[in-house]
Amino acid sequence: MTLKLYDDAAGTSEVGASLVITHETDLSDNPQDFQLWYAEVDEDTGDNGIFTYEASSNPGVDQISISIGDTTPGSGHEAAEITLGLTAGDLATNTAGAALDIGTSFLSGASNAETFYMRVENAVTTVSNSLELSLAGNALLKSSTP
């Protein structure tokens, strides 16, 4: 199963291992907002919704979620610098650093991609390359769509 993050709705531009964000050291460019799509397009090239994805913990009941990981808490950037939302408006009210629930199931294919928004509010004023923050989905169960 190849669920990936994309920066386009068609699922043609994969985010890859890292999202490059440049910040000013005086923080004058805060915040920076992005729209991303979570999808499986490699195995459903016909965009037919042939697979259904559900949380493996309790399929069809538990939420599929996207969480923010921090490999070095207390050092460099913190998960609290990122806010996730289902809409751009949610970025102003959702809790920074919190996981985002996107539903109990979704279908494969680009047209079924789950879109969400991410706000990055830099709090680090030193010049550096930081790779300690990540986005990840919970474990999913894939089944053929009836």
Tell me the role of every PLM-derived stretch.
Residues 15-23, 98-104, 119-120:
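Short structured motifs
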